[in-house]
Amino acid sequence: DRLIHLREVEKLNFSFIIQVDTLCHRLPNFIAKCARAGVKKVFIGLENINPDNLLAAKKRQNKITEYRTMLLAWQKAGVLTYAGYITGFPGDTAESIIRDVEIIKKELPIDVLEFFYLTPLPGSEDHQKMFRAGAWMDPDLNKYDLYHVTAGHPKMSREEWDFAYREAWRRYYSFEHCETIMRRAAALRAFGNTLFAVSWFKGCIEIEDVHPIEGGLLRIKDRLSRRPTMPMEPAWRFYPRYFAEVVSKTARWVWLYGRLRRIYLRIKHDPKRYEYTDLAITPVADDEAETHQMFQTDSGQAFLDRQRRLERARKDGGGDKPEPMVAAE
């Protein structure tokens, strides 16, 4: 309320990004107030759409039956949705990761999705367990950035996991799906920074080969900044190669942004842009969960069964007692 006062009464112009959990939309007026307070982007800890993987991540509060309702609530408030998705849970395979990405593209209206490797970060519980079990972990701490494979997987080889991870990025940020993202945003009147966001994420992966949270418009390299074990590259070789790299990447960035901007302008000037609809931006019906691909797995059906039992128990108990919630992680 104080932030709203500063913006609407004191006329201070500011905006920010917040991080929330997947049940924040249940808090009365929370999303509407966030939008008025200046929230332009919201990071949502989606983590996964597989119920077993969510339990492994200790995300019991994440209810996949409510993902779309929550995402639509943010988008209708004009806030760009930004979610993280972890690959490499024990039950994952290359095929299941790719399948889940295709389901997300079809059924969830996420603007920006970033992918991570499941990583045993030093100091975490996972790292401690793996260390005590004597499991292999990459000794190079520079790779613990969630963008490199740093541990083994029970069902995938390192090559399979890496392929699935790269394929997830490629499929989600295909030009076809980038257009779908922008069409959804236009239909919901939430265009905002969608063009910049999809350009940034697609370009960082395909041009710079760095995670978007570590990316930038110009990659600065210092010839003298080398690991002690690596030889120093001579100036006559380093600077011409660096210059050529900058020119090449800049040209690719310009081409990429230009192509996406043409898509953006075509949608923006389409008189029927507000009429666009698909499954992801269709309001959720009470009985539609069973028809979604998201639930056409053993774990998905088991999750639905548990939810039905809990709902019956609440009704039999004489009321709808809400589950404990927190508004931000």
Residue ranges and their predicted role:
Residues 5-195, 215-218, 271-329:
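A structural motif corresponding to the C-terminal lobe/cap of the Radical SAM core domain
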Residues 176-273, 278:
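Alpha-helical membrane-targeting segments
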